[in-house]
Amino acid sequence: MTPLVGAQTTVLSLQNGIDAAERIGKVIGVDHAIGGATWISSALEAPGVIKQMSQFRRIVVGELSGGISPRVETLVEAFRPTGVTIEATDDIRKILWTKFVFISSASSLGSLTRLPMGEYRAVPETRAMIVSLMKEVMAVAHAQGIALDADVVEKSLAFIDASAPHIKAS
């Protein structure tokens, strides 16, 4: 990929996790990488055909170093006509960890139970388990110096509760 990166190239990482953009930056140069988080539910329907499984589609982007740069603003403007809700943040690391509280817990519980969110959210024991998982990830974030909002667990649970019953976390 490095030979394709020019002076004006920007690569946006929308991968789940907390360090994908940093890893990309190590390969192509940190000045070319932008961090991002996305909330979307989709499934591979056939080779090359991706089906959106819900109405939510949100992207948050930001510079790894913090702040909102002109290239982040340009990226946001480029996405606007697509119908995807997109916003810039001056603290992408906080956003990535906030999503990680949700995705790591929901994905782990989905893998363990082999159930969609609608089924495991309704069982008191698995609901308690997801809260415990979220609090553990939140503690790791705090240990890494990331100041997450105090209500991140409650907001993550509200997102799960508002999701269609058949949705699975990736």
Where do the PLM segments sit?
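Long, charge-rich low-complexity segments
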Residues: 153-161
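Short secondary-structure capping/turn micro-motifs that flank functional sites
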Residues: 42, 95-96, 157-158
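Serine-centered coil/turn micro-motif
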Residues: 9, 69, 169-170
